[in-house]
Amino acid sequence: MRRALVLILVLICTLPALSQAKRPFTFEDMMALKRVGEPVPSPDGKWVLFSAVDVDLAADKKTPHVWIVPLASETQGPSTALGMTGERMIIADQDADRPRWSPDGKRFAFISTKENGSQVWIADVDSAAGAVTGVRRLTDIKSGAGGELWSPDGKNILFTSDVYPGCDNSPADEAACNAKRLEEWKESKVKALLFDRLLYRHWNAYKEGKRSHIFVVPVEVKTPTLPNTGAGWGTLVSEARDLTPGDYDAPVFSLGGQDDYALSSDGQELCYASNHDKVEAISTNNDLWIVPVNWDANAKPADVLAKTKNITVDNPASDSNPLYSPDGKWIAYRAQQRPGDESDRFRLMILDRATGEKRNLAQPMDDWINWFTWTPDSSEIFFVATDAEARNRGQTTIWSTTVAPNMSAPKNLHSGERALAVISMKRITRGYDDDLVFTREGRAILFTRMSLEHPSQIQRLVLPARLDPSDLPQGEQLTHLNDSVLSQIAMSPLESFWFEGAYGDKVQGFLVKPPNFDAGKKYPVKFLIHGGPEGAWGDDWSYRWNPELFAANGYVVIMINFHGSTGYGQKFIDAINDDWGGAPFEDLMKGLDYAEKTYPFIDKDRECALGASYGGYAINWILGHTDRFKCLVSHDGMFNSTSAWGTTEELWFNDWEFKGTPYTNRDSYDKWSPHLYATKFKTPTLVIHGQLDYRLDVSEGFQLFTTLQRLGVPSKMLYFPDEGHWVLKPQNSQLWYRTVNGWVDQWTGVR
């Protein structure tokens, strides 16, 4: 009897633990997660809009929807004051992305492909209930519309569209011309393209003679006086005005960051980034241009161009991401200083609109400035960046800096910059944060936060009167769309370690343990190598190379931020220049050596290395320089440096990294080309490449696979005819993970 009672008590105690047992992460779990976008607070301070992408694995489809969540007053606690708790999808019967509130808060614009391709739609909102009362399509442009932006008075919306520059004329003529050319292309049996300059394709698509332009259209559309031309613009045929005519992209394709165009606070001026250099493929000289927004009906493209002005003509490197101050006095933007170097440090600049004077506001920071926003009173800019403290945790955090340059002070003779009247930089958060924006009252910020164990969620932080750097507030989590799924999953936190790498520098590595980790066991290793090469591993979430998913079936995952990685200062980034297989390779090997010696649970006889982009190059380099790994996975990597130069679209990158072209600096291209070390290839290798990869052409993968097969090295190639540099389609991604993990399991003996 006593034994029975004891058994019952044991069961009672253990059942809760059993019911709460978490399981390893699976690909299906990852596809069940909703992908939360940036927060968009309402002007009345009651609501936050955001988009979230749902993945239907069976249908091989990703669909964005618009959601809403209540936002309490900045003096209240958790956001439950309006009678609604948690998030609610408010546009469910069509795809809907990029929500943007109107200035009066009575409606919002969004992008949808429900009818006639990508178009701008308007949703009317009951602000008291946070409910949509109706939707209508605003644009009906054959070339599609995206990137919508409200004018401050709510009367106009700007949007972008890829159009034929030769069609520049009156709005009606331009609409008809574009529609006619698009229809001719669609109906023609001939799909040949004739090129007469470089940058004829980019990323994963051919440009087909089109340019991105910015248009403005009234929200309350009047009946056109001209007859319907059948051009496909419907009631907008005489209304949409091209503000950036000409044979240039406006905005230019981005080197990173937020929107590359913005409206002044009075709605009278547009600022956008565009590159007007003769050979775009070798230039990073994106400049900021300004143009008036309002034009009469008789204005011609030549009139618009005559009023367009380059305000950063003095900088031969990239200027991008303009953002006007709320008081209209300043334009903040990001700038680089070295022409042709896409990995030069992004600086936070401001331009005085009255005088044209420019100033670096975050000069003390030796790191990239990422997303930024103004305070409502225009006194400060909040931005995202990394410093030594954040770097140690693998994070990027939110900072603030005052806007108080002394424009009357003399310029420094060497830097050309003026002294600051006051400079005050403060850390605001600790986390991997991004997408920040202020609420109406200016005392709270909204932002997204992620970690290795959690995809993006929206946070709200009420700013205290005084910040304690040792105890920064975490804020309130507003979105909980993924909590249910994640509560069932066993994940491991990111662990950091440091070791002595190339040049005696301290180099950082990270480690992720498998679920249900047992320190007394030995575990095989997946050694991940990041791309860029100017990128970095950190405490962030990824759907394409997810360390938690790689660890889930019993592996220790190790990642090294080798020389060239971001977050450790510009000198550390620059160290990879013309040294692709030098210091980075040394760091990778020393980092793995350190991990093997430090962590007794690592089985150094069962290690595989995996990498994509530059990581793929590193794998190809490893093939010819060490046989320590049981297997390798090379995804979209450079194999032949000369052919990679001739087939990439962004030629400035190779020109900078290898200090010239193959015909001006052949020694560098030969020295760092993996294909010239093929006689040493021995390690079993899985090659992966996409047909639509124009950054590193698919021929690089074919050359590698051909070489491996000719040498008799065990190898396979996974070829995606419908993917580019990244594998994005859900079922393709499923196949990618299954093939990669299966290959590694095969050679490490995991069953």
Residue ranges and their predicted role:
Residues M1-P16, A72-R88, S127-G130, T223-S238, ...:
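Intrinsic disorder/low-complexity segments
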Residues V40, L158-T160, E187, K191-D196, ...:
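Non-catalytic accessory segments flanking enzyme active sites
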Residues P43-D44, P103-D104, P152-D153, S265-D266, ...:
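Residue-level detector of Asp-centered blade-edge/turn motifs that repeat once per structural unit
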Residues G45-V48, F108, I157, L270, ...:
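Hydrophobic beta-strand positions that form the internal "hydrophobic ladder"
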Residues A52-H65, M89-D97, A109-W121, A129, ...:
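A flexible loop/linker signature enriched in serine peptidases of the S9 family
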Residues K521-G531:
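Short beta-strand element of the alpha/beta-hydrolase
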Residues L528, N546, A551-A552, M559-R751:
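Active-site-proximal cap/loop segments of hydrolase catalytic domains
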